[in-house]
Amino acid sequence: MYDYIKGQLTKITAKYIVVEANGLGYMINVANPYSFTDSVNQLVTIYLHQVIREDAHLLFGFHTKDEKDVFLKLISVSGIGPTTALAIVAVDDNEGLVNAIDNSDIKYLMKFPKIGKKTAQQMVLDLAGKFVEAPQETGNTKARSNKAGNTQLDEAIEALLALGYKATELKKIRAFFEGTSETAEQYIKSALKLLMKG
């Protein structure tokens, strides 16, 4: 098992990043790949969780230990796999997640992709009181204005689709942001907040 990787960030896609270490390129699934844009071709440290399946060995990566801790707690819940957990971690307001669990707010939890009533109830049952404190905001929140525009919005929509959000939901998101100029990372952060508001 891996705890973290330190290497050069060489590639960003809508679903994953690639970090090169010791001559090998590691494909790492992350919640918001575009939050790493400022670190391309730079040395990065990514906290890791490895999932071994019969057909694949998958790596899931995180900016911080807190983010990884939230992910690990989520995948301990019956009915939540790593992809769904990653989609939940993608939402900046992890404090909202913790509050919803501790206050048995099933309706809020059901706003996450692939989380139905039964799984939301299981989250409350398994995780209530397990978070000592709400994790800090994750990722790089520094605003960037380069490469803004429709291409950035397209990349954000693609990343949200990869997290499990429905195309019908994202049509409204696209319409909401048309004509604006942000980075893909900023679009994703704003879109996730809108999606959680319903």
UniProtKB/Swiss-Prot annotation:
One matching Pfam family: RuvA_C
Gene Ontology cellular-component annotations: cytoplasm; Holliday junction helicase complex; Holliday junction resolvase complex
Cross-referenced SUPFAM superfamilies: DNA helicase RuvA subunit, C-terminal domain, Nucleic acid-binding proteins, RuvA domain 2-like
Single GO biological process annotation from the record: DNA repair
MF terms in GO: ATP binding; four-way junction DNA binding; four-way junction helicase activity
Region (Flexible linker): 143-147
Signal peptide: none
Superkingdom, taxonomy of origin: Bacteria
Keyword field contains Membrane: no
Stretches the record annotates as Domain I: 1-63
Predominant localisation class: cytoplasm
Entry keyword annotation includes DNA repair: yes
Location of the region described as Domain III in the Swiss-Prot/TrEMBL record: 148-198
Keyword field: Cytoplasm, DNA damage, DNA recombination, DNA repair, DNA-binding
InterPro entries: DNA_helicase_Holl-junc_RuvA_I, Hlx-hairpin-Hlx_DNA-bd_motif, NA-bd_OB-fold, RuvA, RuvA_2-like, RuvA_C, RuvA_C_sf
Family the UniProt entry places it in: Belongs to the RuvA family.
Subunit structure and binding partners: Homotetramer. Forms an RuvA(8)-RuvB(12)-Holliday junction (HJ) complex. HJ DNA is sandwiched between 2 RuvA tetramers; dsDNA enters through RuvA and exits via RuvB. An RuvB hexamer assembles on each DNA strand where it exits the tetramer. Each RuvB hexamer is contacted by two RuvA subunits (via domain III) on 2 adjacent RuvB subunits; this complex drives branch migration. In the full resolvosome a probable DNA-RuvA(4)-RuvB(12)-RuvC(2) complex forms which resolves the HJ.
Function statement: The RuvA-RuvB-RuvC complex processes Holliday junction (HJ) DNA during genetic recombination and DNA repair, while the RuvA-RuvB complex plays an important role in the rescue of blocked DNA replication forks via replication fork reversal (RFR). RuvA specifically binds to HJ cruciform DNA, conferring on it an open structure. The RuvB hexamer acts as an ATP-dependent pump, pulling dsDNA into and through the RuvAB complex. HJ branch migration allows RuvC to scan DNA until it finds its consensus sequence, where it cleaves and resolves the cruciform DNA.
Name of the protein described by the UniProt record: Holliday junction branch migration complex subunit RuvA
Species per Swiss-Prot/TrEMBL record: Streptococcus pyogenes serotype M18 (strain MGAS8232)
Primary gene name: ruvA
